[in-house]
UniProtKB/Swiss-Prot annotation:
It comes from the Bacteria. PROSITE patterns: RIBOSOMAL_S9. One of its GO terms (cellular component) is small ribosomal subunit. The keyword Protein transport does not apply. Belongs to the universal ribosomal protein uS9 family. The keyword Transport does not apply. InterPro entries: Ribosomal_Su5_D2-typ_SF (IPR020568), Ribosomal_uS9 (IPR000754), Ribosomal_uS9_bac/plastid (IPR023035), Ribosomal_uS9_CS (IPR020574), Ribsml_uS5_D2-typ_fold_subgr (IPR014721). This is Small ribosomal subunit protein uS9. Keywords: Ribonucleoprotein, Ribosomal protein. GO terms for biological process: translation. GO terms for molecular function: RNA binding; structural constituent of ribosome.
Amino acid sequence: MSEKFEYGTGRRKTATARTRIYAGSGGITVNGRSFENYFPRKTLQMIIRQPLVLAKLADKLDVRVNVAGGGVTGQAEAVRHGISRALLLVDPALRPVLKKAGFLTRDARKKERKKYGLRAARARYQYSKR
């Protein structure tokens, strides 16, 4: 496989996406499957396409992604982050556009841990006065 590609890593919650961008015709492959097959929800497909559409490169580049961990939404947002980072290597002039859209920022929000003595991270057990 001697095709030239640009590489980007994206993360969200516990999901990690390793993204490769090739010159091509607009195909997106996730874990060896078409991304419409891997992410059947239209909202997730839209999230993944956002950086390519914003950069007006949706039909000029092929994307191959390996994604692991997390749930479907976290994985889709990790893929978006990875594609955005790889696009910077394709064309550094895209930085202000992608940054303004918030695609280059790693969303650091994670699930807060459950604390002892509580029912969940912050929720208490029901209190009965009598």
